């Protein structure tokens, strides 16, 4: 455990905070910090259509939250809609007679393309909907959630939905849909749609602890910096970036960006210092991360937490990124004490009995609530 005064950076309490431990999803704070350090969180990912003779190419750019129908400009999921893209494509082709048999539709998902699944991820976790293949294109409705796994090939599922949208918009499409070879000529740009701001996507990934969304967001952001699109390289880049921000990364390494790999080892100190850095108002992009973390008993992965009489004081006050794997539980975030001090705190329990996950969560919630109740000054 480590507790820090957010305003001064002074360590108020620390116990075994320099021992490397499996972080589970608290690692997402490190990933978000690395993304925010070099990425414009107000930017967007653009899904495009290009034309080359009789071929229309759907060019992926990292938006895995597409709507099958029309987009909703006020939403993060479904912000950009394939129906809108199809209608814009139809408008661009209105003076062009379709080729005999229809337009050939192909998918280009070569940008930031890499392994879909990390070597250490359990197949059972994929089938259970705890994660999904990491792609650069996907439907919001096809996101993996516990008990509801995604389709085998989310990018092609989205492309098939786009084909249907084209047909609805009056554009005949030939079968089959194909994938464009890497570095193939993409043709002339004719239509596009933009995702929600990257910061909003990152906020959603952390709020719901979405492993695949975190991985795809990180992979696409890191590709802009020339980082190879693998899980291991993403982990290395996160640690390298944190070190460049002045954080002590000794004995820490990440095997992926989401925290799902059990071989990742980081110190509580590193997680807490990254959380404290994000709480510093001089780092506005990083502050965006903390401002939108789940709130105890209200939102995200904390919506059903702090439910006991002993933890009611923490409700609505504690913010945290949660971390949960079998035998592992964690919280890292911010809270305000009864004396009005903003604290950052990080707690990791990595030796809990596998059958006591609920008890572990309750214990973590109790510790955070105790910090709220104290007069730390």
Spans of model-derived segments:
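Generic structural signal for residues positioned in beta-strands
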Residues: 57, 104-106, 136-138, 204, ...
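Active-site-adjacent loops and short helices of periplasmic peptidoglycan-processing enzymes
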Residues: 1-156, 169-203, 207-213
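Short secondary-structure transition/capping segments
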Residues: 43-51, 90-102, 145-160, 219-228, ...
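Short amphipathic alpha-helical signal-transduction/dimerization elements
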Residues: 36, 40, 163, 167, ...
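Residue-level detector of alpha-helical recognition elements and their boundaries
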Residues: 24, 46-47, 73, 220, ...
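Small-residue-rich helix-loop
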Residues: 14, 223-377
């Amino acid at each position: 455990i480590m507790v820090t005064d957010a305003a001064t950076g002074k360590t108020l309490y620390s116990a075994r905070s320099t021992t490397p431990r499996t972080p589970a999803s608290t690692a997402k704070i490190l990933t978000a910090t690395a993304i925010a350090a070099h990425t414009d969180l107000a930017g967007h990912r653009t899904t495009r259509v290009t034309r080359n003779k009789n071929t229309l190419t759907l060019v992926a750019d990292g938006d895995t939250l597409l709507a099958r129908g029309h987009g909703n400009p006020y939403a993060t999921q479904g912000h950009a809609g394939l129906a809108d893209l199809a209608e814009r494509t139809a408008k661009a082709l209105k003076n062009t007679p379709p080729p005999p048999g229809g337009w050939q539709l192909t998918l280009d998902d070569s940008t930031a393309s890499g392994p879909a699944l990390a070597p250490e991820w359990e197949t059972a976790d994929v089938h259970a909907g705890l994660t999904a293949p990491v792609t650069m294109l996907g439907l919001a409705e096809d996101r993996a959630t516990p008990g509801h796994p995604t389709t085998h090939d989310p990018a092609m599922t989205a492309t098939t939905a786009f084909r249907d949208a084209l047909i609805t918009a009056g554009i005949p499409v030939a079968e089959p849909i194909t994938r464009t070879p890497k570095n193939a000529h993409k043709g002339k740009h004719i239509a596009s749609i933009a995702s929600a701001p990257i910061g909003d996507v990152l906020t959603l990934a952390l709020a719901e602890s979405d492993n695949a969304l975190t991985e795809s967001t990180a992979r696409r952001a890191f590709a802009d910096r020339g980082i190879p699109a693998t899980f291991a390289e993403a982990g290395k880049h996160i640690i390298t970036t944190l070190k460049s921000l002045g954080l002590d990364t000794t004995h820490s390494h990440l095997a992926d960006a989401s925290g799902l790999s059990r071989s990742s080892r980081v110190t509580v100190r590193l997680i807490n210092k990254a959380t404290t850095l994000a709480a510093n108002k001089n780092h506005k992009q990083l502050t965006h991360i903390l401002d939108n973390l789940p709130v105890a008993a209200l939102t995200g992965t904390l919506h059903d937490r702090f439910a006991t009489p002993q933890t009611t004081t923490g409700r609505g006050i504690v913010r945290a990124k949660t971390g949960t794997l079998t035998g592992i539980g964690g919280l890292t975030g911010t809270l305000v004490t009864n004396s009005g001090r903003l604290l950052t705190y990080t707690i990791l329990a990595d030796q809990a009995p596998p059958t006591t996950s609920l008890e572990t969560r309750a214990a973590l919630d109790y510790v955070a609530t105790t910090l709220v109740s104290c007069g730390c000054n």
